[in-house]
């Protein structure tokens, strides 16, 4: 077992052994294709009756709700099975529509680990324990953040070129924890990768994962940019031939 696996095992055991006063019950909003991180803004349209009920309760009682990526099942219809690590969301804006639907804006606050799912209401709830990210002020976190910084700048530049849009970063945060979450939110990668980042035990682990993902994405973006001009010429075709778009 490597150090990262040992760290994850310790974190799992810490959650299981959490004192009762550190546990809380959260309404759970399982989502497909969304991994919420602390500090991330999440707009949602609420139309299912069970989630209208849930959000109305959160508004009235000023409760957060938990956002968790779906592991199995669908958003609409029968209850989906979520991953075990998610992020609590605080509602900051509500727009009520005439037909009872709502547009809300929420912000991710803190990570949690699901200990027990409950389905005794129209929507899922769960007993959860706080899952703080650790080792943000260590030398290792600082060293890894310095390794990630230039990759982030290169990534934004190549992504801008590939998407033909003007993406800019005014300034990268100095704090390794803030940088780790910013990169996690910004990376254009799949849900599996995003969930892996969310489940990282500490800042060094998250930054190390991000460094590897950035290296992979940089190679892909460089290839896309290098071959785009050749593909455009190929699509035009030589005189007398028709090439499909």
Name each model-derived stretch.
Residues 2-245:
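N-terminal low-complexity, acidic/polar interaction/targeting segments
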């Amino acid at each position: 077992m490597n150090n990262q696996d040992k760290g994850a095992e310790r974190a799992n055991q810490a959650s299981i052994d959490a004192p009762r006063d550190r546990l809380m019950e959260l309404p759970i909003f399982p989502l497909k294709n969304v991994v919420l991180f602390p500090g991330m803004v999440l707009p949602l349209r609420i139309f299912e009756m069970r989630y209208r009920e849930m959000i109305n309760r959160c508004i009235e009682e000023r409760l957060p709700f938990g956002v968790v990526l779906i592991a199995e099942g669908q958003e609409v219809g029968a209850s989906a099975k979520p991953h075990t690590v998610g992020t609590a969301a605080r509602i900051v804006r509500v727009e009520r529509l005439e037909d009872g639907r709502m547009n809300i804006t929420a912000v991710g606050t803190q990570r949690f680990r699901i200990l027990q799912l409950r389905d005794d209401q129209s929507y899922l709830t769960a007993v959860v324990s706080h899952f703080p990210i650790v080792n943000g002020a260590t030398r290792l976190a600082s060293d890894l953040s310095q390794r990630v910084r230039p990759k982030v700048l290169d990534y934004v530049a190549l992504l801008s070129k590939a998407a033909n849009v003007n993406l800019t970063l005014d300034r990268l945060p100095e704090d390794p924890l803030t940088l780790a979450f910013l990169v996690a939110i910004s990376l254009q990668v799949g849900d599996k990768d995003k969930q892996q980042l969310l489940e990282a035990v500490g800042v060094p682990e998250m930054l190390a994962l991000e460094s590897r993902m950035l290296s992979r994405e940089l190679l892909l973006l460089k290839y896309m940019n290098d071959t785009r001009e050749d593909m455009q010429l190929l699509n035009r075709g030589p005189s007398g031939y028709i090439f499909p778009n």
